[in-house]
Amino acid sequence: SMPEGGINLPPQKLQPGNYTLKAGKFEENTSGGIKKYTVQAEAGGETFALQQLQIALPQQISELGKRYTLAAGKSLQGAENLSEGIAYAGELGEILQSLDVKNFAAFKEMDFPSKSTFEEYGLGGALYYDDGNYSKSIAANSKNIKGEGVLVSKMSIFIADGTKMPDFCVIISDGQIEIGKNAVLGKALLLSKYDITVKSGASVNGIALCDGRLIVEDEVTFTRDESVLQPFVTAYRLKQQ
């Protein structure tokens, strides 16, 4: 039987077998801007469920991202070398207070994968969460990581030198975030409760905000993309029963 509430989709006849498929979409769990939806379906006595997350930024952070492309709680270094028209600010104090990394734990869909997994499957539209005691290096053997994803870690996240991530990704860390030399991020939101470093020759389209120091090394290209502030919707996955 279907849960109460939610949206019931009109019943469909399945052929062969003349089964009736009943399905509904339900909001199951919500906390700190993260909503979990379940699509439950039954046909011929079988039931299955898919889940999907919608991850929205706290309003305070969204407002900040609308004002600045780069913003730091402590110091901001190197932003003056970027192309004109990029709004940036340093010494803003604790600007990411409304962001709690631990809030993502209950919604975790995947562990941080290995080089070869990134290589083969890309980010796959999932929320990756890690609360371990080691920093995470995001790398693929070919240096290409396709697909959208949200990477959240208690410790630092390092994007390896030369890595190309063309699709929408959100990177959130309680530690530091480092974008390696000559790395290319096609559409990225970087949020660190500590420091962010964009190494020389890297190219980023998006927005970067941190509570600590933000360092932009030489020959970096940083282009504003305000669309990274929109809610991130994960791909449908089979629900873990």
Stretch-by-stretch model annotation:
Residues 228-241:
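Short, low-complexity, Pro/Ser/Thr/Gly-rich segments in the mature regions of secreted, periplasmic
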Residues 1-5:
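Membrane-proximal N-terminal amphipathic helix
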Residues 13-146, 151, 155-165, 169-228:
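Short, ordered "entry" segments at domain starts
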